[in-house]
């Protein structure tokens, strides 16, 4: 009787231990897989990044054909230093200004150019005559003039700070010349002379 009771309690403990072990195992597996970190969503890459990766990380403003067809032209700037006088008054310090009277040339032909030499073979003397160096940017500067009597006068002058090349086409010049020629060639009194001649002929016949 005692042995049967011990055997019964032993089976009961074995069943309880088996259930708790299976529950512990299931809990462990659930906890393990519930804390799996999801991969972070990739940040949307912009088109510029994709293009940069495809082009090897280099950015080009234009293609090679544009480089050969478009010739960038610049002025050979002339700098002058002079004194300004007004009667018996002369500027205390010399005035340094930029004179836009140089020749327009491609950038590779300018003395301070450090880039490549593309586009120079398309340049000719005729092309240089179509471009003119003109004023681009100016600023107002104050200068002091000292007179012989010891007084000091202050003047405001405009100083050129940058030059640019402006293109004048040959057709524009020719059309302007033709317009002037035709306007000058038309006699104003031509029709009046005809009327006078017709009137004089009528009087003579009458």
Swiss-Prot record:
InterPro entries tied to this protein: Cys_knot_C, Cystine-knot_cytokine, Sclerostin/SOSTDC1
Protein task: Can activate or inhibit Wnt signaling in a context-dependent manner. Activates the canonical Wnt pathway whereby acts through Disheveled proteins and beta-catenin. Antagonises Wnt signaling through the canonical pathways presumably by blocking accessibility of certain WNTs to their receptors. Induces posterior neural markers via components of the canonical Wnt pathway.
Assigned protein family: Belongs to the sclerostin family.
Disulfide bonds: 75-133, 89-147, 100-163, 104-165
Subcellular location: Secreted
Main location: secreted
Molecular function, one GO term: BMP binding
GO cellular component, one term: extracellular space
Keywords: Disulfide bond, Glycoprotein, Secreted, Signal, Wnt signaling pathway
Record flagged with keyword Cell membrane: no
Originating gene: SOSTDC1
Sequence ranges assigned to domain CTCK in this UniProt record: 75-170
Protein name per Swiss-Prot or TrEMBL: Sclerostin domain-containing protein 1
PROSITE patterns reported for this sequence: CTCK_2 (PS01225)
Pfam families attached to this UniProt entry: Sclerostin (PF05463)
